[in-house]
């Protein structure tokens, strides 16, 4: 655990960030789907008409939009619900540059990411807490092109082709990964800081609060 140089109270307030709570039954975990539309800064999904806008890597490759969810959709991957970002001309994902994601203050067990990486990336994601401390959490995302889960992730979406700036390469699959990061501290988290790694791209974020934590907080019967 590392002492914050700046107290979490100076972080952005949670007011205004769209979040959505999903719980199937009182005995199941609660998921918090975090909106990241305001942080979108990179194009990594293109259609046949805008191939040249892709910026997933240095060569301008991108995922085919036809094989991924439409903007704004609620999707489920391996039982985890996600809010797919509302893409615009400037971005459909967050290229990680140390952005802060403010979240409703609460106790969380896991961070789930739909993410992709140029080659494989392993870096630090920070969780900020209301006691003035932050925890460094390791996150690893495997290569979107290789398709091998180096860090134990699950494939979130696999496509049958990859887009280049001037053509579509059929038969060259790509992978967007479902990554999981544990939050072991029993404290109330206020915000997350994404890694400083421009090779890492985040498309959706969901947080999980365990049933044992919710009972301790008096939020379940």
What are these model-derived regions, one by one?
Residues 1-221:
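N-terminal/edge-of-domain interface segments
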